[in-house]
């Protein structure tokens, strides 16, 4: 599996509870926080839910 770097670029304030939980599951919480994750189908699904809040790079 490929590793991707996920960076949160938009605040979670005034976002739905589901989107906040997805960000927490990814290991994000504050603006400009970054994590590296394996690109599994479950991570892809989470990224689809919060694609307007994060930037994904290879």
UniProtKB/Swiss-Prot annotation:
Entries under CDD domains matching the protein: Ribosomal_L30
BP GO terms, sorted: translation
PROSITE patterns in alphabetical order: RIBOSOMAL_L30 (PS00634)
This protein's GO CC annotations: cytosolic large ribosomal subunit
Pfam families: Ribosomal_L30
Keywords: Ribonucleoprotein, Ribosomal protein
Molecular-function GO term, any one: structural constituent of ribosome
Ribonucleoprotein among keywords: yes
InterPro entries: Ribo_uL30_ferredoxin-like_sf, Ribosomal_uL30_bac-type, Ribosomal_uL30_CS, Ribosomal_uL30_ferredoxin-like
Quaternary assembly: Part of the 50S ribosomal subunit.
PANTHER family assigned to the protein according to its UniProt record, in alphabetical order: LARGE RIBOSOMAL SUBUNIT PROTEIN UL30M, MITOCHONDRIAL RIBOSOMAL PROTEIN L30
Family: Belongs to the universal ribosomal protein uL30 family.
HAMAP family attached to this UniProt entry: Ribosomal_uL30_B
Name of the featured protein: Large ribosomal subunit protein uL30
Organism of this sequence: Cytophaga hutchinsonii (strain ATCC 33406 / DSM 1761 / CIP 103989 / NBRC 15051 / NCIMB 9469 / D465)
Lineage: Bacteria, Pseudomonadati, Bacteroidota, Cytophagia, Cytophagales
């Amino acid at each position: 599996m490929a590793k991707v770097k996920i960076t949160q670029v938009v605040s979670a304030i005034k976002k739905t509870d589901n989107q906040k939980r997805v960000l927490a599951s990814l290991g994000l919480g504050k603006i400009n926080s970054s994590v590296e994750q394996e690109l599994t189908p479950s991570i892809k699904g989470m990224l689809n839910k919060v694609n307007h809040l994060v930037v994904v790079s290879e």
